[in-house]
């Protein structure tokens, strides 16, 4: 890229301390390699190994930190304080997007469809949860991504083990009504929705979990997604409203379901999605003509807004 010098010195933020560190290292290395191939002066920067105050030596930052510390507004706040432009969503939108309950509350308040849920505490009567949500349910840590700590619960006697698994990752746990149907993901670039992708994990996988996302090679990705043109546009419009409602910006991803009656349900938002070989944003942008290198440069272009 002939004018790559306009970016100056770029820190590719990767790794970190969250449960998603390994994925972030893979994503970050892929982004770093793409930027270097594009002529950008980019360097890896792992906040686990270096003080974030060293970021003053860079002109801008490409955030590829997944999970806590990188996707929850913390590193965004540091970069704001240091007056360093960065990719993706700002402090508030990142903090909201990392909190599944806050996200749902905002969507509900915006009259957007999201699956019913209950916050689980030690005092929660699990029978009342089953009465309200039915079975199966999915148990989730509220502040983790990449499906870390999630479990599908089909029998009441399995509740306790699923909650114990989730609490290993987060003090706050939620139960969400299980939506039977087709799973879709909608990626965003420059704040606009990309072609919808249908996710079809193999039959032995209960849902699109961590292993399916990053380790298995038998997940099917449907592009085109199998929806009619009208339905796809409806889902894209719904997800754009949801993306904007939580304050997400630039690039990201929203996961959704279509139930057996044809209704769409929003699951969650990802403000720093994966950028590995298995990842969904690169698959969506490839469908509209972007190479991976072009995608990375396009995301970085966002940091020039108002500074060029």
UniProtKB/Swiss-Prot annotation:
Cofactor note: Binds 2 magnesium or manganese ions per subunit.
Pathway(s) the chain acts in: Cell wall biogenesis; peptidoglycan biosynthesis
Catalytic activity: 2 D-alanine + ATP = D-alanyl-D-alanine + ADP + phosphate + H(+)
Subcellular location, record wording: Cytoplasm
Keywords assigned by UniProt, alphabetized: ATP-binding, Cell shape, Cell wall biogenesis/degradation, Cytoplasm, Ligase, Magnesium, Manganese, Metal-binding, Nucleotide-binding, Peptidoglycan synthesis
Annotated ATP binding sites: 130-185
Chief location bin: cytoplasm
EC number in record: 6.3.2.4
Residues that, per the record, bind Mg(2+) 2: 268, 270
Cofactor(s) needed by this chain: Mg(2+); Mn(2+)
BP terms from Gene Ontology: cell wall organization; peptidoglycan biosynthetic process; regulation of cell shape
Residues where Mg(2+) 1 binds: 255, 268
InterPro entries for this protein: ATP-grasp, D-Ala_lig_Van_CS, D_ala_D_ala, Dala_Dala_lig_C, Dala_Dala_lig_N, PreATP-grasp_dom_sf
One of the record's GO molecular function terms: metal ion binding
Keyword Metal-binding belongs to the record: yes
Ranges where the ATP-grasp domain occurs: 104-301
Keyword Ligase (UniProt): yes
Known function: Cell wall formation.
PANTHER family: D-ALANINE--D-ALANINE LIGASE, D-ALANINE--D-ALANINE LIGASE B
HAMAP family the UniProt entry points to: Dala_Dala_lig
Protein family: Belongs to the D-alanine--D-alanine ligase family.
Annotated protein name in UniProt: D-alanine--D-alanine ligase
Organism from which the protein derives: Acinetobacter baumannii (strain SDF)
Lineage: Bacteria, Pseudomonadati, Pseudomonadota, Gammaproteobacteria, Moraxellales
Primary gene name: ddl
